[in-house]
Amino acid sequence: MSRTASYAGMTTPVKDKEGHGIPCLQPIDVVECTYQYFTKSQNKLSLRVGDLIYVLTKGSNGWWDGVLIRHSANNNNNSLILDRGWFPPSFTRSILNELHGVPEIGNELEIFQAGLNLKLELSSNPVILSLEDFLDCCRDIEFKEQLAWSPIPVHERKGCCELLYYNQDLDVYCRTLPYLPQNQVETVNDYSSFPAISKIAGKKMPITSSPDLFYLNDCDVVYWYDLTRLVCHYVNLTERDLLANEREKFLTSLDLLTAQITCVYMLFRNLRLVEDSFKKTLKKLIYTLSRFSINANIWFHSTPFEEREAIASQKDPERRSPLLQSILGTFQKFHFLLRLLHFLSNPNELTILPQLTPRFFKDSFNTISWNNPFLRKHLNQHMSHDLPRQMIKAVAGASGIVAENNDEIPASKQGTSCSSETSHHSPSAPFQRRRRGTIFSNVPGSSDESDTIWSKRKKPYPLNEETLSLVRARKEQLDAKLKQMIKSANEYLSNTANFSKMLNFEMNFKTYEEVSGTIPIIDILENLDLTIYLNLRELGDENRVFDEDVAIDDEDKEFLKHSLSSLSYILSDYFNMKQYFHDVVVKFIIVAQHLTLEDPFVFSPMQNDLPTGYYEPMKPSSLNLDNAKDKKNGSQNTDIQEEEDEYEPDPDSLILFHNLINQDSDFNDLKFFNLAHVFKKSCDDYFDVLKLSIEFVNRLILERENLLNYAARMMKNNITELLLRGEEGYGSYDGGETAEKSDTNAVYADSDTKDNDEWRDSQVKLPRYLQREYDSELIWGSNNRIKGGSKHALISYLTDNEKKDLFFNITFLITFRSIFTTTEFLSYLISQYNLDPPEDLCFEEYNEWVTKKLIPVKCRVVEIMTTFFKQYWFPGYDEPDLATLNLDYFAQVAIKENITGSVELLKEVNQKFKHGNMQEATAPMKTLDQQICQEHYWGTLYSTTESILAVDPVLFATQLTILEHEIYCEITIFDCLQKIWKNKYTKSYGASPGLNEFISFANKLTNFISYSIVKEADKSKRAKLLSHFIFIAEYCRKFNNFSSMTAIISALYSSSIYRLEKTWQAVIPQTRDLLQSLDKLMDPKKNFINYRSELKSLHSAPCVPFFGVYLSDLTFTDSGNPDYLVLEHGLKGVHDEKKYINFNKRSRLVDILQEIIYFKKTHYDFTKDRTVIECISNSLENIPHIEKQYQLSLIIEPKPRKKVVPNSNSNNKSQEKSRDDQTDEGKTSTKKDRFSKFQLHKTKKKAPKVSK
């Protein structure tokens, strides 16, 4: 803020003892605060009525600079506190030349009304300090924070430099460093400096109303200003009701005012403001309030209503009755004492007050009844019940213990009579083992008794059909018992006379048996695995905790945001259903217990007559006297609303009811009804909530499948991986279908695997110097494949001279980068080439070792190296350390030793490392069609409906298949590995150009089809387009082009297309059935079992597979299986410390890659139409995203006003389908009808009635 001023208050220097002029604080005016002004800004002053401000500068921008001097809150000394800052002059009045007091009080009521809106009395005798006294105060001030003085050099004309000291807070320059009082050094007697003693010597501190500690309401009192404003509001409201002659409202306002005065008294006690002046003022305040209450009641009882109304309506106070004037005078005195008490306390307006109203601690109350995983900050710590740190400190401080965490809290208390020095000597036990006697004994989640079912189950229930079957099976078992209980209730209603008391006890017993059978369902509802929805919320958060290496583009973010908004209400309804389940079961138990009571209404008088939240503070927006009356009436009318009685009245109870009326007894607004009818209704509700639980579990399962279905169809494997991260079972993924490949689909068949057992037996018969050294470190699987092993063992098996395992060799060379670095891998091969002979060999044994092992191993090493550089080399494998291996020298040595294949190895090494241009040498040759595309050969675009419908579906599907198969053939195994590994093993992989182009083409095709439909305004043309694309998808299926077929289906089931009900009605049913059959083929249930069966039956036919399944298999196999195996010994809990490579994981990856490569070998025998292909390619560019298409969809078919209730048993085929099934009005009404709370006794809740 600028300090431009018209008057400067610091120009006159003050000379010190040596005669040097020093700039100092010199006020130019003195003003008194007339209105309260509060601010949180550090450079502005917070003002109270009556404060004196010494003005230093009057700024031209409307803000003045001043100094405020107050006495310290510590009344034991006369120290001063100085505040300097900006303040608005409109809240003050100048008193420098007006040294006069406030006019004497003439009319008490008018002055009281003038001060209702927080206008405290001004000082009658303001004391203004002289300049000398003011400077003395400035020298002896006690600052809130220690002032920082910065040395600043100042150059004068003679060239010398002078050092000044500048304080930014005061904006003051000094020639010498001022002497300021420092805080006294804490002595050893201060027990708070010692952690061990402070726990027992610390004072009990009140728990403050911190928003970070509690779930506060908007109307909660946090600061002194809020409390003062609230109390004054009730004061004004009480007086207004008194003068308005409204007795019932007056008593209500007086009751609320008394409650607020009680809060004030509690605050003074909690803040330890117990000086004599405070005690006396508080006593006078309470006494005055009591006197006012008594006099007001006398006024209402002794004076008739009409007379009171006439007296209160008198505008002249002198014509009012003496009793009313006395009441108003007492009330004014009460208001004066309240302001006096506030002035004496002299608190800091920004100090947070102690918490008085009951509120839930944050992140702690969710473990009482139902578990809410969305409240956990650490999503993977399902079993963690640690309390929040702030809650621990607050509760411990309230008990006089200074604790930072759970372990510092004593395990038990020794008793109040123990001295502080011997109370706690032993270390505190862990918090989780503490049961009774601690300060957290009554805190939810602090003991084992309050733990939920979640903490007792090790694994959550997955969201699948198996879990749903468990719920259904349990419900069927409960239905049979429940029907019998309903039958008994009906018999009672039909024949009450023969219904014995013993039968009531029997029904009560069956109720408990029924409820105990509900525990498995509660267990499932409590422990459902909602990890995918938790991850969805975290993905939508800007500060997500996932790896930064995961790239999420704008389209993915749009999809995640859309999914989160459409699923949020389902999750909200699910948790409401759980609470509704709890309410129904509780009511079921209570009603069953009432059957055994002689008087079922015996506990009714214990019910509170006041509505819930009666004493809650009012919102700041409602603290306006003009509309407070209407708002209060509306609130009370809402609270006393009563639902219509659904229960059949009991004739005997009605007789009792009329007798009570005749006797003028208080019946507390009870509704008497037949308990058997209530029991039957409770059974029906219990039956319905069981059905409701199955419905919601089924909905969560379907929404999970829809979410993964969309991600899989759009080939967003990164989104799928993030959504499933941390889900139970995700870490132990079993490839299932992917591991079982037919012989015709297997590219590399190892015919020798059948003889592996015989070969391993033959190795044992060899001499020790010819046996492999690391055979004991190999782990074999049941399919005669290597499951794992150490690095040395795998290299030894790779270069074995007798056993050539072709599948192992290919798997190793493809996936070696997940085991070794390139330098490390080649170093192992060179070490294997230079094998050292075993010790203690004779001459004949050495010659045999060289002939039968060393030379063959050298040949295998050269062969493996040559194959690696020739067929499996990737530019991303290059590393700077490879130059240290001198591979060309190694190849030349092999040539000198006449090793087979060494010449070809030297040629490959020179080509890769000396001639450069590795990427150009190894990059696949581009096809002629791609070169033509780059020469900007543009065909006619399919930009209109007529141009699309003019193309024959067979021709369109044929050319689409040719184009997509060509793109599919450009996908390499390195593209697939790059897609799943990313930067996991190396940062030089880069992008996956072939695979990214294939995925981009499929997504563009989906957007093109959906956009072609929504941009058409005519409904009949849209219907023709739908049928046209369905026929194209059918022909794509006949051509085994599952990629294009899935892209078309995804477009037709997208949110912007599926919601067009009028357009779909114009499509003939046979065509819609055809679409359903295509969608059923790509159903993601059971890991695309229908599609996998269809794909497996193709054998040698050409095909363009749906790549989303491959991406899911690759992602799950890589992320769901560990890189290393841990072998367990015979002793429990003892593990082998040596790491064994999980080679089975690499084998599964290669199995999937084999199938991908297999479909690249068989080509289509179709004639290529270059014009159609170019039109298709060019039409897919510059298509709007899904959000723009959805807006167009709303334009051509707006949302209906009335909600269409969807079939709850229908299976939504994609995440976008259910987006429009619910409207806001529908959601609200459904929740209200489905989760309405029950009350056994329908009692009106309202304020106490007072007759006039």
Curated annotation (Swiss-Prot):
Residues 409-454, 623-648, 1201-1252 are annotated as: Disordered. Residues 1239-1252 have a biased composition (Basic residues). Residues 26-97 form the SH3 domain. The keyword Metal-binding does not apply. Residues 416-428 have a biased composition (Low complexity). Signal peptide: none annotated. GO terms for molecular function: guanyl-nucleotide exchange factor activity. Residues 782-914 form the N-terminal Ras-GEF domain. SMART domains: RasGEF (SM00147), RasGEFN (SM00229), SH3 (SM00326). CDD domains: RasGEF, REM, SH3_Sdc25. InterPro entries: Ras-like_GEF, Ras-like_Gua-exchang_fac_N, Ras_G-nucl-exch_fac_CS, Ras_GEF_dom_sf, RASGEF_cat_dom, RASGEF_cat_dom_sf, SH3-like_dom_sf, SH3_domain. Pfam families: RasGEF, RasGEF_N. Residues 952-1199 form the Ras-GEF domain. One of its GO terms (cellular component) is plasma membrane. Suppresses the CDC25-5 mutation in yeast (restores cAMP level) and has similar functions as CDC25. Promotes the exchange of Ras-bound GDP by GTP. This is Guanine nucleotide exchange factor SDC25. It comes from Saccharomyces cerevisiae (strain RM11-1a) (Baker's yeast).
